[in-house]
């Protein structure tokens, strides 16, 4: 029996402890190379971001602080849907069978979560830059808002990546994404807007550490659910 066949047989059973940093790094490198070669996807998202921000500028000019904050997170949400939700939907059946034979499900899902988190950190930074250039800079604490935007982008990417993994197994993935995503995304988006308000003034917001801890705890829960549930989806 060849080494490839032995590896395939070892990886097929459901395993919750088979986490390999080397395999995760290899899969992450694969996603980065594909993104680099298919640059039309990345630049398509950039065009969407730039056009959305420019339309907001033409419509509203320089909005007030709360409106600026809300528009930023709503824009980031739709960018995340376009950038992250396709991560599993673009994988064909043949490619998924190939991955099924050579890697464990935990390594596969973790590589997707890491890649999408890095992608959304980049998009969060670009979104913030465009908003500050076109819609003004109402921020009092720019670095704080930048950190929160990266954390928020990662949080949104984790949820949508997990939902995309579930929806990819359904016959109507877009409908499944909408049905499952609405009750999860809306509370998270409202929480991000509330946390980000502190970056617009010098007033200390009560309970801010608890809100950030709640957001981080939600992210950890999503990672844990992906770690536990994705192997069963993978086997199916």
Predicted ranges, named:
Residues 150-182, 234-236:
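A structural motif at transmembrane helix-loop-helix junctions in multipass membrane proteins
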Residues 105-132:
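Selective transmembrane-helix segments that form parts of the transport pathway or gating/packing helices
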Residues 133, 219-236:
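Junction motif at the cytosolic side of a transmembrane helix
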Residues 39-61, 73-77, 180-191, 217-225:
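Hydrophobic alpha-helical transmembrane segments of multi-pass membrane transport/permease proteins
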């Amino acid at each position: 029996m060849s080494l490839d066949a032995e590896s395939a047989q070892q990886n097929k059973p459901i395993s919750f402890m088979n986490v390999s940093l080397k395999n995760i790094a290899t899969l992450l490198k694969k996603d980065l190379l594909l993104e680099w070669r298919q640059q039309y996807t990345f630049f398509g998202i950039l065009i969407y971001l730039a056009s959305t921000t420019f339309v907001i500028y033409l419509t509203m000019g320089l909005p007030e602080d709360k409106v600026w904050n809300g528009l930023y997170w709503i824009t980031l949400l739709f960018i995340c849907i376009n950038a992250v939700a396709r991560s599993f939907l673009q994988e064909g059946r043949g490619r998924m069978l190939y991955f099924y034979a050579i890697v464990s499900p935990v390594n596969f899902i973790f590589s997707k979560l890491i890649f999408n988190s890095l992608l959304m950190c980049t998009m969060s930074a670009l979104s913030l830059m465009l908003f500050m250039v076109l819609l003004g800079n109402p921020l009092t604490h720019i670095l704080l808002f930048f950190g929160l935007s990266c954390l928020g982008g990662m949080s949104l990417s984790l949820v949508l990546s997990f939902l995309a993994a579930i929806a990819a197994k359904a016959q109507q993935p877009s409908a499944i994404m909408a049905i499952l995503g609405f009750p999860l995304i809306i509370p998270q988006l409202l929480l991000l807007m509330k946390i980000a308000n502190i970056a617009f003034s010098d007033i200390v917001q009560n309970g801010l550490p608890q809100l950030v801890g709640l957001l981080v705890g939600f992210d950890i829960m999503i990672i844990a659910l992906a770690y536990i549930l994705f192997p069963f989806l993978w086997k199916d």
